[in-house]
Curated annotation (Swiss-Prot):
Native source species: Escherichia coli (strain K12)
Keywords: Cell outer membrane, Cytolysis, Disulfide bond, Host cell lysis by virus, Lipoprotein, Membrane, Palmitate, Signal, Viral release from host cell
Family under the similarity heading: Belongs to the lambdalikevirus o-spanin family.
GO biological-process terms attached to the record: viral release from host cell by cytolysis
Signal peptide: 1-19
Role, per record: Component of the spanin complex that disrupts the outer membrane and causes cell lysis during virus exit. The spanin complex conducts the final step in cell lysis by disrupting the outer membrane after holin and endolysin action have permeabilized the inner membrane and degraded the host peptidoglycans.
Highest taxon of source: Bacteria
Assembly with partners or alone: Homodimer; disulfide-linked. Interacts (via C-terminus) with RZ (via C-terminus). Part of the spanin complex which spans the entire periplasmic space. The spanin complex is composed of spanin, inner membrane subunit and spanin, outer membrane subunit.
Gene Ontology annotations for the cellular component aspect, listed alphabetically: cell outer membrane
Protein name: Prophage outer membrane lipoprotein RzoR
Residues bearing a lipid moiety (N-palmitoyl cysteine): C20
Amino acid sequence: MRKLKMMLCVMMLPLVVVGCTSKQSVSQCVKPPPPPAWIMQPPPDWQTPLNGIISPSGNDW
């Protein structure tokens, strides 16, 4: 049993040493592309055309 523990310790030691000494690479932040032009335009006015088609219930036919 003691020999097994010693063998595990010897096998794990290189993994621990390599894990502590290696540096993780840091990726650069990617700048997002600018928004498309259609997003920057004001929203369309749907209320005005609809008012000509749909009228309040005051008009009785």
